[in-house]
């Protein structure tokens, strides 16, 4: 038997004593990229990289509900069905409900952070730096 918890309410001590505990963190950029490429047939490498990078960065924000891999896949499918080949402000605005279920989270992402994050992602791809290597630099830039 496998029990899962999204931490919306605490499990009792008695139940915890009878269980083995395993914490599964959000995937790395590389792992999430592989998941998107495998689970979303037809998605381009470029868009999949941008999505994985965006998700990596958005999970660093102080959100009420951090989107998980299920939301990443829903969002990827929505973007693909809308025939998007790259992330831009319009694409994010039109599909933001796939990722964020709280208005406050949507408002936070729609602010100046969105333009800065997208610009940094596109710049890293243009420069050939590689998003995996660029993410820590981008994180520092967005915090400043």
Which sequence ranges carry the predicted segments?
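C-terminal regulatory/interaction module of P-loop NTP-utilizing enzymes
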Residues: 1-144
């Amino acid at each position: 038997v496998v029990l899962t918890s999204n931490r919306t309410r605490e499990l009792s001590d008695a139940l915890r004593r009878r269980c083995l505990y395993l914490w599964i963190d959000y995937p790395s950029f590389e792992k999430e990229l592989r998941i998107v490429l495998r689970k979303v047939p037809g998605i381009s490498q470029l868009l999949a990289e941008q999505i994985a990078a965006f998700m990596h960065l958005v999970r660093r924000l102080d959100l009420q509900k951090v989107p998980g891999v299920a939301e990443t896949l829903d969002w990827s499918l929505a973007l693909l069905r809308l025939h998007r080949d790259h992330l831009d402000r319009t694409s994010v605005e039109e599909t933001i409900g796939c990722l964020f279920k709280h208005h406050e989270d949507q408002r936070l992402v729609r602010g100046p952070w969105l333009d800065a994050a997208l610009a940094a992602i596109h710049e890293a791809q243009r420069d050939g730096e590689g998003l995996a290597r660029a993410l820590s630099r981008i994180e520092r830039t967005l915090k400043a």
